[in-house]
Amino acid sequence: MAERKGTAKVDFLKKIEKEIQQKWDTERVFEVNASSLEKQTSKGKYFVTFPYPYMNGRLHLGHTFSLSKCEFAVGYQRLKGKCCLFPFGLHCTGMPIKACADKLKREIELYGCPPDFPDEEDEEEETNVKTEDTRIKDKAKGKKSKAAAKAGSSKYQWGIMKSLGLSDEEIVKFSEAEHWLDYFPPLAIQDLKRLGLKVDWRRSFITTDVNPYYDSFVRWQFLTLRERNKIKFGKRYTIYSPKDGQPCMDHDRQTGEGVGPQEYTLLKLKVLEPYPSKLSGLKGKNIFLVAATLRPETLFGQTNCWVRPDMKYIGFETVNGDIFICTQKAARNMSYQGFTKDNGVVPVVKELMGEEILGASLSAPLTSYKVIYVLPMLTIKEDKGTGVVTSVPSDSPDDIAALRDLKKKQALRAKYGIRDDMVLPFEPVPVIEIPGFGNLSAVTICDELKIQSQNDREKLAEAKEKIYLKGFYEGIMLVDGFKGQKVQDVKKTIQKKMIDAGDALIYMEPEKQVMSRSSDECVVALCDQWYLDYGEENWKKQTSQCLKNLETFCEETRRNFEATLGWLQEHACSRTYGLGTHLPWDEQWLIESLSDSTIYMAFYTVAHLLQGGNLHGQAESPLGIRPQQMTKEVWDYVFFKEAPFPKTQIAKEKLDQLKQEFEFWYPVDLRVSGKDLVPNHLSYYLYNHVAMWPEQSDKWPTAVRANGHLLLNSEKMSKSTGNFLTLTQAIDKFSADGMRLALADAGDTVEDANFVEAMADAGILRLYTWVEWVKEMVANWDSLRSGPANTFNDRVFASELNAGIIKTDQNYEKMMFKEALKTGFFEFQAAKDKYRELAVEGMHRELVFRFIEVQTLLLAPFCPHLCEHIWTLLGKPDSIMNASWPVAGPVDEVLIHSSQYLMEVTHDLRLRLKNYMMPAKGKKTDKQPLQKPSHCTIYVAKNYPPWQHTTLSVLRKHFEANNRKLPDNKVIASELGSMPELKKYMKKVMPFVAMIKENLEKMGPRILDLQLEFDEKAVLMENIVYLTNSLELEHIEVKFASEAEDKIREDCCPGKPLNVFRIEPGVSISLVNPQPSNGHFSTKIEIRQGDNCDSIIRRLMKMNRGIKDLSKVKLMRFDDPLLGPRRVPVLGKEHTEKTPISEHAVFNVDLMSKKIHLTENGIRVDIGDTIIYLVH
């Protein structure tokens, strides 16, 4: 991106922002209390929340994009007269902060302070192997993945902290987890305040037991959930050290911090008899090769199964007597997950090498092939999955590459004893349609990248990167039973169907290798712990009812919710390590981060009355309530309408004040988040609200808006590549309003949005230009036109303002902010620029200032600082934060259409004039350039020519019969071609149909009308001065096409005028300026028949750009046209022996004799070959 030339404009915006933020702070504009609002709620309230961000670093542009949706919504709803609350908390619960602090502590213990680290050895490059490592991230592990994301490229925590710009002295403090809670939350608030958020900061808090009020609130929530039988105790998957005999949490790990369990679908591939000789001793037993897959939805396309010939495998007996074949490592994991009779014991019945089961025949679930075979793949690794891999060449680049190797290389088949019939008949089966890659995505991408074999590891990794994520988010199923459904919606359903049928099992292993401090490689084990029973039927049913009434703004979000409710089961809500609130009935457990963050929006409603504005809840409570007084019964009374008044020392009126706040603000009117939180946090949010208020559906969430991820300059944000911006960096670079404008423009849907730096820079220029224009208008108030605002362009501009208000209102209401920015700023500014250009009589004062006021209000949710500043420039006494949405007056659509017509005609005429001036093709171009025409006749048609009239009638008939759509061109061409009256015109007919179809898209059904809704001749005549000036012509006349020659009559149609340019002949005379030292010169000018002073002065102004004002020029003729021009002018006597030419005088030209005379008051006067012009 090109370097900026300077920062004056962005500095100007930042200076305004600082002043305005100070003003808001002083006036406490965003602080709201239910007690003072209840009397004035005729237009309702609006309570919006954003998932509190995790406090292990600075906020970045991705956070800002999501929260900007809340911010814009609040800005709009304030203008609509609602009482708005936007609170903002900060999340500290969970493992990452504690793990980072403990890691720092360990580094200091091992390497000193500051640490002297050993040279980092080159880490072994991880080979891309057939283990499906390009996987869809498990969003439920969002907090852990954040820890990984913060790690950057440094191996050591100390290095990571250094990369944040911290000194050695400061870093040491971060070895205590509490310091993180003191350091990052104030920075987050500082950055968000710079953004200009409309937040009531009194209600902010941090989570964990550091804040005794929040701690008490979460304990109350969990006691209530347990009381209602929503929390159970039982076995859950966790990282476990067999050597230590206990779960291995982050602080117990030598390597693998932040790593959690990875869920696979374990596919059972039944070995068919006759068994391979190595397995013959197991005759009578059910033997299965078990393959671990992350992509159960692809299994409809299995063609074979892979094993590595030189890898060791075992067969072990499962709890029900079946034999599973896999690696020893996978069997060890399975033995801790209930697969074997005794926990942790693998009863091995057979040891074998992969090559000993090659060629075995299998029965595989879901695939259309009745029998598939075990084939060799040389790149399988032992440290991931089971060592057995099922092959889906339609959707896996590794599989199609390996299958092609075997098909192409007879010698390879012979080496491993593979018969042709085990390989050659098996072709990829279409399972999933992926936009851009078709229904055999792996085949397509391998051909595109020219992948030659399974050893092209780098290209195969690139291929998987390209199709796996796209396949998950955009892939559409093609198989029966799931046809037309999105992959992400059916993935879990397919997995469940297979498990229920006994064809698959859930299998877990660590995402990456985890080594305990005792140097034991960890497994995933089923361990006892507390969990929320989300799958429970009645709870799920009630949550589905909540979802039915939830506004999701787009169908994809609703489908994602529905799919999640379909598969969501128990969720472990307790941990033994990290920060957070302890389970009230079992203090050894901490409540984990996705479980203490489901109904905290209720805490926002009362936080300011408890905490005294202190994030940690350590200040004196405004109501004098101590944390320990907030018992379960007290919380019940505050949040449950029917709960009795508790035994407490707190005065009733104080608890009633808390209750009033909750009752006033609840439910949450809008929650905004990234779409990746739908399958976890947002679904838990619905579940928990239903559980806590089962009989009060009026307390359930009202709306959830999910957005896509944010790209930066069309690329993924990444610290390692440097394509990354923190919130504070973005504000420094673009100002708050400049950044907000670009965020609004980044995107509205659940697809990925794009923050473009060039757009942000262009936005800064637009905002600066806008405020400068407002200043200019305020300064020139007196010189603007007054009186009735009733010219054609006045009326058009007024209608366009009103239409803009209505469209922008609709876009804001639907949370389509990119569209609201388009209709409420870009199109609004374009309407003003058009008015300024068209209003040849000058802009009307009343309209200009109505425009400024309306524009400021429409833009205020996006750019509040600048709009507050402009509001002040307009002399408004109150803050724009207390203003109301503008009232739209009547909209004359016909008038707007007629103005659009005028702009199109002007554009067409300019193009035609340009083409007229260009030498004809094929002719020599060394001739003089063509002389510019002086006159133009525009022909307008009252009706369509007969052939067009007939064509339009046919199109309208089809449009109305075909559900307001036009059929294919073949259908239209067939009917029109059979009509005798059109035979002569068929060359013109289909291009005319194409033009109508194109305009139908742009302008709607009115394009099919046989007559225009306005008088186009009248529109052109009202704007004749503008058209003449715009084309720099002398004169334009408008006539009906019926007055023109045949060709024009045949082709001219309503709304598409034709024209003829011409050069009106004239006689050249000298135009002399006798005034000394004024920069005006003498020139030759053409005088044409019928000219007057006005037309001659306008012609002069085109040649002499120094003349700005027509009224300042005066024309004079010599009393003696023959001798007068020969006399030397005398200084100060420029008027002597000359007569002023009246504005009513008409010039007459005799082309034959090349002479000019004036007709004035019926008297004819010769003027010779020279006249005088004076500029005053």
From Swiss-Prot:
Residues 117-126 have a biased composition (Acidic residues). This is Leucine--tRNA ligase, cytoplasmic. Its main location: cytoplasm. The modification N6-acetyllysine is found at residues 970, 1047. One of its GO terms (biological process) is leucyl-tRNA aminoacylation. A motif ('KMSKS' region) lies at residues 716-720. GO terms for molecular function: aminoacyl-tRNA deacylase activity; ATP binding; leucine-tRNA ligase activity. Its EC number is 6.1.1.4. 5-fluoro-1,3-dihydro-1-hydroxy-1,2-benzoxaborole inhibits LARS1 by forming a covalent adduct with the 3' adenosine of tRNA(Leu) at the editing site, thus locking the enzyme in an inactive conformation. It catalyses: tRNA(Leu) + L-leucine + ATP = L-leucyl-tRNA(Leu) + AMP + diphosphate; L-methionyl-tRNA(Leu) + H2O = tRNA(Leu) + L-methionine + H(+). It comes from Pongo abelii (Sumatran orangutan). L-leucine binds at residues 52, 54, 594, 597. It is an enzyme of class 6 (ligase). Residues 260-509 are annotated as: Editing domain. CDD domains: Anticodon_Ia_Leu_AEc. One of its GO terms (cellular component) is cytoplasm. Aminoacyl-tRNA synthetase that catalyzes the specific attachment of leucine to its cognate tRNA (tRNA(Leu)). It performs tRNA aminoacylation in a two-step reaction: Leu is initially activated by ATP to form a leucyl-adenylate (Leu-AMP) intermediate; then the leucyl moiety is transferred to the acceptor 3' end of the tRNA to yield leucyl-tRNA. To improve the fidelity of catalytic reactions, it is also able to hydrolyze misactivated aminoacyl-adenylate intermediates (pre-transfer editing) and mischarged aminoacyl-tRNAs (post-transfer editing).
